Amino acid sequence: MEDPGETEAHPLGATSLNFVPGYQQEEKPSPDPLYDTPDARGVQAGGSQQPARTVSLRERLLITRPVWLQLRANAAAALHVLRTEPPGTFLVRKSNTRQCQTLCVRLPEASGPSFVSSHYLQESPGGISLEGSELTFPDLVQLICAYCHTRDILLLPLPLPRAIHQAATHKELEAISHLGMEFWSSSLNTKNQQRPSEAPQIPRLKARSPQELDQGTGAALCFFNPLFPGDLGPTKREKFKRSFKVRVSTETSSPLSPPAVPPPPVPVLPGTSSSQTERLPPRQLLQRESSVGYRVPGSASGPSLPPLPSLQEVDCCSPSSSEEEGSSGSPTTSPRLSRPRHRRPLLRSMSSAFCSLLAPERQVGRAATMLMQNRYTAVGQLVQDLLTQVRVGPESRELQGIRQALSRARAMLSAELGPEKLLPPERLELVLEKSLHRSVLKPLRPILAARLRRRLSTDGSLGRLAEGFRLARTQGPGAFGSHLNLSSPVEIEPVRQKLLQLLRAYSPSAQIKWLLQACKLLYTALKTQAGENAGADEFLPLLSLVLAQCDLPDLLLEAEYMSELLEPTLLTGEGGYYLTSLSASLALLSGLSQAHALPLSPAQELQRSLALWEQRRLPATHNFQHLLRVAYQDPSTGCTSKTLAVPPGSSIATLSQLCATKFRVTQPDAFGLFLYKDQGYHRLPPEALVHRLPTTGYLIYRRAERPETQRAATEKTKTGNERPERGAWEEEKGGLNGEGKSEIAVDQEGKDQARGGHMQLEEQKAEGCPALEE
């Protein structure tokens, strides 16, 4: 069936009746088919041929859900479907044993005996996630969208079937969706392995003779910049024109050299005005240039192009910006200004190279901004919903919720843009964080600041801080028990300007940079007064006094703003340290107005708030408990160490087996765990618990047939059923794990004497062996 807008094919020279004047042919309506069914090659077989808008990945998954979401299929059916599919093909079914959804993924042939891996889906009030993964998504479709771009815990990303990926319209996708489970065995399901054989061959480059180059025949020369794959506009052409001037012409056959005079402009065709030439697209202008001789690249050809931006626009701190202004400011140039004029091409080249280095970051930033502005994408829906929710009204723990949403959005953007951009992971994270701040925090900054100011004014925090500022300015350094002071306004004003920049910034990362610059100025002044040995004891009173003299009460709400919205990894570095110093100084100033507050120590409210903040923002420490650091000295390789995870309630026998496995001991029965304490070795019974061992001493894993062991056995025989070794450590309380890591010194020794073994242990400690005292 033909489309209404298409005409029938006629023999050469025949005229269609539809175009004869006065002839009216009765048009029969062409019914639009219910589905546009693509053929096996992915070409549309029916329907309108008009180009439609691009179908997003989320829309493809939503429409074709009956194909990949088979909740009634069992494990055998999933294996049968995925058996002939390429690696990465996926199905979602329902597990009969655990009564939850399962993601089945086809694995490569060389991955193992099983060609399908199953991953259980966990549903929680916060969303849905794969078992063992930390990424959580609102629904199943967004989860599949994310794993189409990233692997996370999967072996490889999830590709769409070829027919679904190449479908151009919603009707084609609906036709595929109508097949359901039968799609996998239909002719539409073409395998991706056939793609390399069907791909068209790349045409080989054809070399041209110098005569063809001189006459301008064939394809024109081109310049390609991999950093700007789609940007070959007039600005790039003008850049080359300014950098060097070479012309290839049909007038002379002399070697290429810079022309003495500017070349003439592009000739205008007869009957065409210059204004019409200016309105022509760049491709037609390029063709007209090639007809008279292609310039590589010429100068002043075609319409006038806008000049390149000066270095001042690229970098206002560049020392060459003043030279550009001086050379272009006056119409007449003196011999003194001629030297900067000759530097222009070099400076422009440096500017272009600098911009080229920054181009990938700008491309990533623009792509991330477009994704966040598009509500039809997963990250766009998340960001837009967040903006709407914050603007509606305040909620409890509002800043913490915004930080969690920013972390989720950054993970989704990293999965979307990571494989396509030439950026290392650490730079990609920084660029995405900056884009999120620009798209989310910049519009919400006035709202959040107003709510923080209202809350802190209601509970009296801002009033107490303002009163503390007044008392600190009145009492001077004596209010903090210090004699250091920045009395000169010349020294205080630079610090105040940095703090004002901090108040104007909307990004927590930028605010931390301004805070670090202000603290650097304070440390410089502190070293001038107190010497190079000045430390935190002198810095905190000086910071408090300078804050009082600057008189900026809004720093209180900015400190909370940064503490809650700053990226978690920055909280453990230098920025987190000085942010804590700022909070402590503000707490000291607020406590000056209270009679019960101590002048030289932070208030109890600060300690409580810092403890709650650390529990909320810093990584949890329960994951690092029950870890034992094991040191092992091999006579051939020397001292090595390993960290072993010992579950709670583990016995010495379990730990001995674990040590034998980790250190590949061939005779584990000949080794045992000993407690080295009070210049003696005490054999630990197998049934003893690891976490109830004393906190002092060394745990040594060594051979059991030692003189110390034999002597201990003799003493044990004499004393009957007494166990001096066990009594030595059972009397003490405590555990090895404590609040952090426990360390076990594991040592393998030969059949030396007891004194020799002690000396060897002391030598290990002197050589840096990681056998540390508990």
From Swiss-Prot:
The modification Phosphoserine is found at residues 16, 209, 257, 330, 334, 351, 609. Pfam families: RIN1, VPS9. Residues 624-706 form the Ras-associating domain. Residues 456-598 form the VPS9 domain. GO terms for molecular function: GTPase activator activity; guanyl-nucleotide exchange factor activity; small GTPase binding. Residues 1-52, 188-211, 249-342, 704-774 are annotated as: Disordered. SUPFAM superfamilies: SH2 domain (SSF55550), VPS9 domain (SSF109993). Residues 68-162 form the SH2 domain. Signal peptide: none annotated. Keywords: Acetylation, Cytoplasm, Cytoskeleton, Endocytosis, GTPase activation, Membrane, Methylation, Phosphoprotein, SH2 domain. Residues 256-268 have a biased composition (Pro residues). The modification N-acetylmethionine is found at residue 1. Transmembrane segments: none annotated. It is found in: Cytoplasm; Membrane; Cytoplasm, Cytoskeleton. The modification Omega-N-methylarginine is found at residue 692. Interacts with the GTP-bound form of Ras proteins (NRAS, HRAS and KRAS). This interaction prevents the association between RAF1 and Ras. Interacts with 14-3-3 proteins YWHAB, YWHAE and YWHAZ when phosphorylated on Ser-351. Interacts with the SH3 domain of ABL1 and ABL2. Interacts with RAB5A. The interaction with Ras is probably regulated and antagonized by the interaction with 14-3-3 proteins. The interaction with 14-3-3 proteins is regulated by phosphorylation on Ser-351. Ras effector protein, which may serve as an inhibitory modulator of neuronal plasticity in aversive memory formation. Can affect Ras signaling at different levels. First, by competing with RAF1 protein for binding to activated Ras. Second, by enhancing signaling from ABL1 and ABL2, which regulate cytoskeletal remodeling. Third, by activating RAB5A, possibly by functioning as a guanine nucleotide exchange factor (GEF) for RAB5A, by exchanging bound GDP for free GTP, and facilitating Ras-activated receptor endocytosis. This is Ras and Rab interactor 1.
